Amino acid sequence: MTNKNAFLEAKTYIPGGVDSPVRAFGSVGSDPVFIDHGNGEFLYDIEGNEYIDYVLSWGPLIFGHCDSDIEEAVIKTAKKGLSFGAPCLLETALAKLVLSKFPWLGKIRFVSSGTEATMSAIRLARGYSKKNGIIKFEGCYHGHSDSLLVKAGSGATTFGYSSSLGVPEDIVKNTHIAIYNDIQSVEQCFKNEDIGVIIVEPIAGNMGLVPADQVFLDALRKLCDEYGAVLIFDEVMSGFRASATGSYEFNKIQADIITFGKVIGGGMSAAAFAAKNEIMEMISPLGGVYQAGTLSGNPVAMAAGLASLSKIYNSPNLYKDLENKSKFIVEALENSAKKAGIALQTEVRGSMWGYFFNDRPVKNYKDALNSDTKMFAKFHAQMIKRGIYLAPSQFETGFVCDKLSQKSLEKTANAIEESFKAL
């Protein structure tokens, strides 16, 4: 079966043919690639084509596809049972491993998705602060829970949605939108509203890769302390991706709550939220903030996460090596764009990298929206034709894995140069 025919059949039974909107390749004007299997840094579609993968399941696969250690842990655990709906030792082991890197956080609760993590973190923060007002930032994506689907990033930006149908005004009336990297817009919210929570991606990855400025994050911490608000860092993407301590490696700010996902599950469906002890004491069964989940902390996902984080902690040069790979790609992009006379902005944070077809530095959502999405679509088409699998949106982040070889990097650089020449 061809990719085109597979997509046609999928659309008969699945809305838009996909289970997550960006996968439909609509923003790049082509049909999606249907994947048969992966191995290392490679993907193989149902037509037998090979691609070097820079999406890596949107971030989780820091050790690439079919990593032997993670596979072994998953298979060994699955043979004992897939899920019990009861406590297991793997939950505690993974909790200890995560918290060892974040000593100011007292406890962690596992869930099954990043959306669950941020949704639960917001509820917990409101319960603790006893205030309903939330500040979120244009272009930051925190999953698809109702109160956070306002000027969100990721697919919401890709498809031009300012919010979502089906979200009542009463749900979002307590969600206040500020401008990323603009502290004055945050201060204005505090002056006019009863704010109990700030949620932010300290390294935004869902409007493209846009790290927050240090002075901006310092000011957020100060405002939360001054007004008695809870500071949530959404590190579903950047946690264990940008570094072994996520954004903390770069900003040294201790958020009150941190959400994790993607890498923490080793490729399985797992996420978490961790908080200071005095906040986490509010969560059920200790306190009155309710949160639960049938598959939360299931043994197979915990085993995958434990294997993934154990490898990370035992690989002292991992993030430096990954950063060098990211820089190699970004330098190839910059050099080829310059030769072609095409404006391009780039960014790197550890194993995360990004680029915008834009003639000005991108510091916020408005800047990102000024990027040339038509040029991006042309570039994406040229790259996938040359066996390079990139995210099908200008507003997503690229990732590298440890399996990515120098040979694959050089093939990528050649594909970049040829693609820019063809634009």
From Swiss-Prot:
UniProt cross-references to Pfam families, sorted A to Z: Aminotran_3 (PF00202)
Record SUPFAM superfamilies: PLP-dependent transferases (SSF53383)
Keyword Ribonucleoprotein on entry: no
Recorded GO CC terms: cytoplasm
Reactions the enzyme catalyzes: (S)-4-amino-5-oxopentanoate = 5-aminolevulinate
Swiss-Prot/TrEMBL cofactor(s): pyridoxal 5'-phosphate
The entry's keywords: Cytoplasm, Isomerase, Porphyrin biosynthesis, Pyridoxal phosphate
GO biological process, alphabetically ordered: protoporphyrinogen IX biosynthetic process
Cytoplasm is among the record's keywords: yes
InterPro entries tied to this protein: 4pyrrol_synth_GluAld_NH2Trfase, Aminotrans_3, Aminotrans_3_PPA_site, PyrdxlP-dep_Trfase, PyrdxlP-dep_Trfase_major, PyrdxlP-dep_Trfase_small
Molecular-function annotations in GO: glutamate-1-semialdehyde 2,1-aminomutase activity; pyridoxal phosphate binding; transaminase activity
Pathway terms, separated by semicolons: Porphyrin-containing compound metabolism; protoporphyrin-IX biosynthesis; 5-aminolevulinate from L-glutamyl-tRNA(Glu): step 2/2
Modified residues (N6-(pyridoxal phosphate)lysine): 262
NCBIfam families (UniProt xref): hemL (TIGR00713), PRK00062.1 (NF000818)
The protein, known as: Glutamate-1-semialdehyde 2,1-aminomutase
Organism in which the protein naturally occurs: Campylobacter fetus subsp. fetus (strain 82-40)
